[in-house]
A protein has these predicted regions:
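Short, glycine/charged-enriched secondary-structure capping and boundary segments
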Residues: 2-4, 25-29, 43-44, 63-66, ...
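Conserved Rossmann-fold NAD(P)-dependent oxidoreductase catalytic core, especially the SDR/UDP-sugar
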Residues: 59-63, 67-109, 117, 121-124
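Short, catalytically relevant binding-site loops at active-site mouths
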Residues: 19, 55-56, 94-97, 131-132
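SDR active-site strand-loop-helix element
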Residues: 14, 51-52, 88-94, 126-128
Length: 197
């Protein structure tokens, strides 16, 4: 969406491997996330968006999942602050809590707390429920969960509405739309609020 916007003159894509986006505004930066702190961008950065995350199956261990979902995201936050970004929007997860007994929710909660400690001008945290949509890799458990949640969605009303699955594109729309709004400090968007975009 920033590629199509008049608000963004250039879009810097920070990636580990070459992407498929071809656009006159897009500038690709291939960087190892181990060396993220060395990233230099000469343009003035207004908005930074981070949707970095993995699964335990892909990571291979809780420690590796934490490295990606917490540590690399914190590193990205540090870099965006160093580059002078006005706003950082990051994807977390429903139930994120640094005190959770669930390793995934605890990792996401720790990531949120570490980003908040960076004292960024504006931090927007998006906590979607199960992310729906096409993936590069097969995730059988998520496919099953998506089918079940899809069938149950009409029943998930009121406070349960936040547990409805959310299309990844809808999260992206919410991140972009809120980047055009003025929020200072830390603002958390829960899954049911994301569904309104």
């Amino acid at each position: 969406m920033p590629l199509a916007s008049v608000e963004h003159q250039r879009v810097h894509l920070v990636q580990r491997r070459p992407g498929t986006v071809e656009h006159s505004k897009a500038i690709e930066h291939l960087v190892s996330f181990e060396e993220l702190s060395s990233l230099e961008i000469e343009d003035r950065i207004t908005d930074a968006f981070c949707a970095l995350g993995t699964t335990i199956a892909k990571a291979g261990s809780v420690e590796q999942l934490q490295r990606v979902d917490r540590d690399y995201v914190q590193d990205f936050g540090r870099v965006t602050k160093k580059l002078g970004a006005e706003r950082l929007s990051v994807v977390s997860a429903i139930g994120a809590d640094p005190k959770s007994i669930n390793y995934f929710n605890r990792t996401k909660g720790e990531m949120e707390a570490l980003l908040a400690e960076l004292d960024l001008p504006s931090l927007r945290i998006f906590r979607p429920s199960l992310l729906l949509g096409a993936r590069e890799e097969r995730r059988p458990k998520e496919v099953v969960a998506g089918v079940v949640l899809g069938a149950l969605s009409p029943l998930l009303a009121g406070p349960l509405r936040r547990y409805r699955g959310v299309e990844a594109a809808q999260v992206a729309r919410a991140m972009y739309a809120t980047s055009l709004e003025d929020f200072s400090a830390v603002r958390i968007f829960e899954s049911d609020e994301i569904q309104g975009y």
